[in-house]
Amino acid sequence: MADLASRITKPDEVAAETPAETPAETAPAASGELGQADGNIEDLGGSGLQEPEWDVEVSLSELQNNEATPFHSATTWQDLGLREDLLKGLLSLNFLKPSKVQGKSLPLMLSDPPRNMLAQSQSGTGKTAAFVTAILSRVDFSKPDQPQALALAPSRELARQIEGVINAIGRFVENKKVAAAIPGVLPRGEPVRASVIVGTPGTVMDIIRRRQLDISQLRVLVLDEADNMLDQQGLGDQCLKVKNMLPKEIQVLLFSATFPENVMKYAGKFAPNAHSLKLQRSELTVKGISQMFIDCPDDNMKYDILCKLYGLMTIGQSVIFVKTRDSASEIERRMVADGHKVSALHAAFDGAERDNLLTKFRQGENKVLITTNVLARGIDVSSVSMVINYDIPMKGRGDTEPDAETYLHRIGRTGRFGRVGVSISFVYDKKSFDALSKIAEMYGIDLVKLDTEDWDEAEERVKEVIKKNRAQASYAPSATEPKAAAGA
């Protein structure tokens, strides 16, 4: 296996290269073609989302028995036969046409009789909007108090985000009721009166056992970040217990950016006879993210280098990923003491604090967030221009092997919706160096080394990418903030 040195692109080589995608090429021309984008609709066209260059590979289980069975991909929302109130909601968010993943997955998810689905696609390609549209299409809103759809997420932050997307896309749906089944929200003993429930597996399992949630008419179950939930022993057990409590005919939809082979096999049993949308490993990493690394002299020097990067972090917004809660809190304490404005967010905070911290970050009140893997997956803040891997993600007993999937999810917090972004990973010893080397080899990443001996050049290199990110801000669709009406 090639070591990290063979994956490194020297800075002078980068400067000499012509970028594969310039901002002008990435940003669609104003051609009148409808697309998913924010900003002035008259000036924008195309998708605006991170669109894979590959055509989505769709494996249809029925083709095993009948090779002539056709399937189609929607090119407009109207092709899907969606309700007018859903169309209105999608258009109000500038989701003007389906992304590739949405166009491939929605006809399959909405087919009758309902079929299970396992869908894999890069971060920022519109997976959440896809399964939310499917959920809202399956629910009978003439029965607003009857639970009919259940979405599970690995963290309260992601559950809250999905809840927000449901409310945004369904903003024009009459009698829509959505409930969050996360710790500290639902009154104990009171029945859940909502047609759509979004929650974490443990809380959902508890309210089913306490008979607060009527599961008799649930039609669809969604697992977002499904590989993470099915692979973790605790979450996987909870998800399986929840599924076994639900009606046997329920439609199961599994979504994630990554599906390791061992999880894929289990997912196939969790959602049998499923349609499958899959990516090749080489297409998993997001090309719009400039992936860099810094070789720190030792573990203690990582903090000093982090502080030197602070000015770059606040050009846009940044997320710093660390291994432990204690590390997050300690780095926050030291940076605040050194005069930097940062916030830490991890699972040791109570639910209300976590909700408040993430809201402030979304609104731009906090520019820099220090966190653990609790925010590695699914969280969508389109203005994040930089991700820092203060600690390389590891897994296995004793952290013996690199966690390549978590690395991919972490850096996917930037480069959202086709915008560019920067990820910077800190290495300081042979173990961290080798771990990043293996991740780079696995995904075919060409890493750029930032020279700490010449900070001016390093800063210019990072700043160039971040400014491109900000220049593309008008191309980022928001699933929670509608475009302001003309003249508003």
UniProtKB/Swiss-Prot annotation:
Motif (DEAD box): 224-227
Entry's Gene Ontology molecular function annotations: ATP binding; ATP hydrolysis activity; RNA binding; RNA helicase activity
Any one Gene Ontology cellular component term annotated for this protein: cytoplasm
UniProt binding sites for ATP: S121, Q122, S123, G124, T125, G126, K127, T128
Any single biological process term in GO: protein transport
Record EC number: 3.6.4.13
Domain Helicase ATP-binding: residue ranges: 108-277
The keyword DNA damage is assigned to this record: no
Domain Helicase C-terminal residue range list: 305-466
Biased composition, class Low complexity, residue ranges: 16-30
Reaction catalysis annotation: ATP + H2O = ADP + phosphate + H(+)
Keywords recorded for this protein, A-Z: ATP-binding, Cytoplasm, Helicase, Hydrolase, Membrane, mRNA transport, Nuclear pore complex, Nucleotide-binding, Nucleus, Protein transport, RNA-binding, Translocation, Transport
UniProt motif (Q motif) ranges: 75-103
Stored Pfam families: DEAD, Helicase_C
Compartments it resides in: Cytoplasm; Nucleus, Nuclear pore complex; Nucleus membrane
Topology term for the membrane: Peripheral membrane protein
Name of the top EC class for this enzyme: hydrolase
Keyword field contains Iron: no
Disulfide topology: none
Region (Disordered): 1-49
Subunit structure: Associates with the nuclear pore complex.
Comment, domains: The Q motif is unique to and characteristic of the DEAD box family of RNA helicases and controls ATP binding and hydrolysis.
Protein name, per record: ATP-dependent RNA helicase DBP5
Lineage of the organism: Eukaryota, Fungi, Dikarya, Ascomycota, Pezizomycotina
